[in-house]
Structures are given as C-alpha cells and as structure tokens.
Amino acid sequence: MKTILTLLFAFSVSTLFSQQNSFKPGAIWPDNNGVHINAHGGGILHYNGIYYWFGEHKTEGRKGNNTLVGVHCYSSKDLYNWKDEGIALKISDDTTSLIQKGCVIERPKVIYNKKNNQFVMWFHHELKGKGYDAAMTGVAVSKNVAGPYKWLKSVNPNAGIWPVNFTAELKAMKFTEKLKDWSEEWKTAVKQGLFVQRDFTKGQMARDMALYVDDNGKAYHIHASEENLTLHISELNDDYTDFTGKYITVAPAGHNEAPSLFKKDGKYFMITSGCTGWAPNAARLMSADSIMGEWSFIGNPCLGDKADITYNSQSTYILPVPGKNGMFIFMADRWVPENAIDGRYIWLPIQFDPKGTPFLEWKDEWSY
C-alpha cells in the first residue's frame, strides 16, 4: 500500500508540473510552481520573444476583490506554460498613499515605449473606502518589463477639454432640469453630453480600460466613462504617460464596459460587455475604419450555447499572436466574486466569417 501511495503522489506531482500544450478555458491553470495563475482582468505584452501577462492579484474571499497585494506578472515562451515573475506593481503600506492597501486596481495593461526604452502600465484605480466613485486611471513605469513599476499618478482624464467629436451645439447645451434616470429624456441628455459637461472641470471618469498601440506607434487609452454609459478613446502622448487632450466618445448611452480592441486588414474592432456587475452578459462587437472615427455596432460576436453570457465570462484583452498572421486570441475572465482568487480564464480563438466579421465559438480545449 505504501508503494502505491508513493506512486500516486509522484504521478500527481508530475501531472501538476507537466508541460501544457493546449488551452482549457475555465480550468485551473497552474504556473511553474503548480499554483493557479493569479492575473485577473489582465493583458499581454510580447517583448523580445517572450509573452508577459499582467493582471490583478486576487486574494481569498470577497475582500480579495479589493487590492491587497498589487499587479502580478507571469512570463511565457508559448502562451501555454507560465513562469511566476512576482508582483510587478506593489501597493503601498503608507495610509496616505492613493495606492494604499485596500484600494482597487483593476484591468492593468502594459505597453512598451520605444522612444524612452520604458514599460508603461495603466490601470483603473479606485480609492480605498470610496467604492467606485473616484473612477480614476493610474500610470506606472519601469525600465524592466517584469518590474518593479513605479506609480506616477492617478487622474481623471482630459479635464477642461471637449471630445473632438462634439459639435459646437453639444458644447453649448445646458442641462438644468432634473431628469429621471433611464427615461428617454435622460438617455437623450446623456448622448448630448450630460456627464461630459458635469465632469468637464475635474476630468472625465475612467473605469474599465484597455490600451492599444497602433502601427504608427500612437498609443490610445480606451475606457468606460460617464457612469459607465459611454466609452472614451483618448490619445496618449509620445511617452505614453499622459493624455494629449484629444479624445472621442463612443456609443453614448450604450452602457458598455470591459473594452478590448484589435485591428485586422485595416479595420478596427472592439469587443465590450454590458454592465451587470460581476455577472456575465452578452458581448458586443463594434467596428471602425479609424480608431478616432465613427464606431458602428455589429452585434454579439458569440455563437452557440451560453452565447448570451459570453460563455460565462467578460472580455479583458485581445492578443494578436506574433508570427501567426491574422491570429487573435480573445481573453476573458470568469469572475468568482465570493472567492476572488478562484477566478478562471477563458481564452478562445477569434474566427472570421467570409465577410471578415469576427466571431467566437466555445471550445473545451484547443491549441494554435
């Protein structure tokens, strides 16, 4: 019996640390130490032939939905097997710091700035004990891809600046009447800039966010704004550490969050979700010929069973796979708010119909 138990233990350890060669959406995903990867709401940076996955480090229970550790980093050469690189951005024990323990840091994304040979991280930032009222975005930098990252600041973007797609008529609008939330009159007012005007002086709200670097090196910050009712796409400066003041509103009063953006054959696509808290809902697909142009709604990109809840997940990032022309991976989170650390990852290949429209189908297991 002792021999059998020894063999079983050896087999289980061997299995735990065995090399992965496929994606298994929703399954436990062990790192090189056999521990479930802890990088929620994350994104990928491909640098010098290595993939770096940055995400929220969650802890046990509901309290784990607040940030108690920081932003975790993992590295991989093949996207299947990941090495724990530790905490890239640590939160502070200083109770006077905006990024103190117990604040909220969500959806961290990292891009590389060639001009300064510097890695730049942006994230959604909420202040400790303030719920989701602050709606700020934070930025941190490092000379080393895996960190440590130094937090620079957190802001409400584009203070004192109108969106470039606002007409003179919209800028001149006056909202004096108290409107009932979700009434048709209220929705019309939102489309006309009700919340843009409200937040004009202090800066706009920035919650769920993504980053995108275009072919010409221009970087953009995409975020849910205006009480999660409207998306904003903001241009970043040449250092990627601040806003230029050029931004547009997208899908006003559309109630989108969890943006993820990619480009194929000169056309931009964005996948978002609706706003139902931690609960999943149907994904939304939009497209545009210019990132700062007019975005058109296409519909739900998901097909098959549970398409109406995005296979029980929410988008976080879309990865263009280097060396695989036209290959994109849809990355999403399956949240477990009652035990945050147990959140799972849903990675699926983006497919394209004959007209070039992206779509998703569930796969229990797949490889590229």
Label each region the model flagged.
Residues 18-368:
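Carbohydrate-active catalytic/glycan-binding domains of CAZyme proteins
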